[in-house]
């Protein structure tokens, strides 16, 4: 039996076989390559549909299947970030071979360059970037509000100046919907006001505006083949988060995101808000934690009922010589790796670990060779996708609590200074990362 948002239904055919065998864990955008699963493509499905496959008995973790017009997305899942219609240094074929079923693209950046109208005339974002998997687009709100002095906000919308040429732009809920419909993503996000998490007065004001904008987005959204997710805001204040969840669930979006986290609050505060907020969201709809994507945050987020994650962290760190291992981050610039013949991670099946040593990767990083950026990115994305697969398997087999304890006890979490998306040690002052403050990957 699989639980949906309507009623329990018995699956039939290949999808049922995949779920019954626990092999939902392997479903990707090309499921025929994984464990022999023959899953039909859902080419004419009107929008996203979420199936809750299995719950963990010892936590809020769950396994699900998100149906999109561009294939099945097993959850929990990590979405690589392709800000400008590309995951930096990787091709769509790379992502396919890594097993990524869904990526995120950025509305703000694509609206400014090359323009959503241009992309629409060229057949939409999937065709434009030659990606046949699912795409989630944000509304552009986070990038606009990160401009700080370059924007002005009112109930009508937000006026801002382009970081590219200084031109004045105006973004409203209706325009955010129009742009995302032109892009043709599988999942679109409402326009919301992103805030500093600790300022209660500002959060109260912004929350009212976020709810008004959510209603306007819902009225303006017209594409039947695109799911629109609401975004719960409210900073670190449980009562504001509860109010936001109440208002947005009443609007009956097909999915819900938790926004405004990992923007300055402590990890303990973030985890506490997730624990209190996730249970307030509909059980049979997907839950998306926006912009959060360190390995430990994936594990702790899944334990609290989150299904979907995205973050620039894995790709940004990779381009600056930092890679993930089972015991934490490795800084390949360290002299200790100068003659290290080992792969980044013993037993890792990614191309980088199958082929190259830490010593060689360190050489590429120090020599600033482009290949180093690519190989490190391949590993970090593989690590995140494999972590999601491992969690799906653990939930399916009833061993998630043991896995979580083992992972957290062995994984050395970066300190607070390094957690800020790789500032200082992990992110050298290079021009290629100078736009990190406006949400580039």
Description of each model-found segment:
Residues 2-3, 9-15, 19, 24-29:
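Hydrophobic alpha-helical signal/anchor motif
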Residues 41, 208-211, 220-344:
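Glycine-rich phosphate/ribose-binding loops and adjacent secondary-structure elements
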Residues 71, 210-217, 248, 277, ...:
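Hydrophobic alpha-helical packing residues
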Residues 40-65, 73-77, 88-89, 192-195, ...:
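C-terminal extensions of enzymes
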Residues 40-223, 335-338:
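Non-catalytic, usually N-terminal nucleic-acid engagement modules in DNA/RNA processing proteins
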Residues 1, 25-26, 34, 40:
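Low-complexity intrinsically disordered segments
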Residues 71, 103, 138, 180, ...:
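Conserved, mostly hydrophobic/aromatic
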């Amino acid at each position: 039996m699989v639980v949906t948002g309507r009623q329990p239904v018995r699956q039939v055919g290949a999808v049922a076989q995949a779920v019954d065998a626990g092999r939902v864990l392997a479903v990707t955008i090309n499921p025929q390559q994984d464990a022999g699963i023959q899953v039909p493509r859902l080419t004419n499905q009107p929008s996203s549909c979420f199936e809750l496959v299995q719950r963990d008995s010892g936590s809020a973790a769950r396994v699900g299947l998100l149906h999109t017009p561009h294939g099945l997305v097993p959850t929990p899942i990590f979405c690589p970030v392709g800000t400008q219609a590309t995951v930096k240094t990787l091709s769509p074929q790379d992502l396919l071979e890594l097993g990524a079923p869904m990526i995120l693209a950025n509305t703000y950046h694509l609206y400014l360059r090359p323009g959503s109208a241009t992309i629409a005339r060229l057949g939409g974002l999937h065709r434009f970037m030659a990606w046949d998997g699912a795409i989630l687009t944000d509304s552009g709100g986070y990038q606009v509000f990160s401009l700080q002095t370059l924007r002005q906000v009112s109930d009508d919308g937000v006026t801002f100046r382009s970081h590219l040429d200084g031109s004045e732009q105006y973004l409203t809920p209706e325009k955010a919907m129009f742009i995302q419909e032109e892009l043709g993503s599988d999942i679109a996000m409402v326009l919301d006001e992103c805030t500093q998490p600790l300022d209660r007065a500002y959060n109260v004001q912004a929350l009212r505006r976020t709810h008004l904008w959510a209603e306007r987005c819902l009225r303006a959204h017209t594409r039947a083949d695109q799911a629109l997710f609401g975004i719960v805001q409210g900073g670190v204040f449980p009562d504001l988060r509860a109010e936001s969840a109440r208002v947005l669930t009443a609007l009956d979006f097909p999915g819900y995101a938790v926004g405004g986290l990992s923007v300055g609050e402590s990890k303990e505060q973030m985890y506490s808000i997730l624990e209190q907020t996730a249970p307030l969201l509909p059980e049979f709809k997907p839950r998306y934690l926006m912009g959060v994507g360190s390995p430990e945050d994936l594990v702790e987020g899944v334990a609290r009922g989150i299904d979907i994650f995205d973050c620039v962290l894995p790709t940004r760190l990779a381009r600056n010589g930092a890679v993930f291992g089972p015991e934490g981050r490795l800084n390949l610039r360290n002299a200790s790796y100068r003659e290290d013949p080992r792969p980044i991670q013993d037993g890792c099946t990614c191309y980088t670990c199958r082929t190259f040593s830490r010593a060689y990767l360190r050489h590429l990083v120090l020599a600033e060779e482009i290949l180093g950026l690519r190989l490190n990115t391949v590993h970090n994305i593989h690590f995140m996708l494999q972590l999601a697969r491992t969690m799906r398997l653990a939930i399916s087999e009833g061993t998630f609590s043991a896995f979580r304890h083992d992972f957290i006890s062995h994984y050395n979490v970066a300190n607070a200074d390094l957690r800020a998306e790789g500032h200082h040690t992990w992110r050298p002052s290079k021009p290629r990362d100078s736009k990190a403050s406006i949400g580039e990957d």
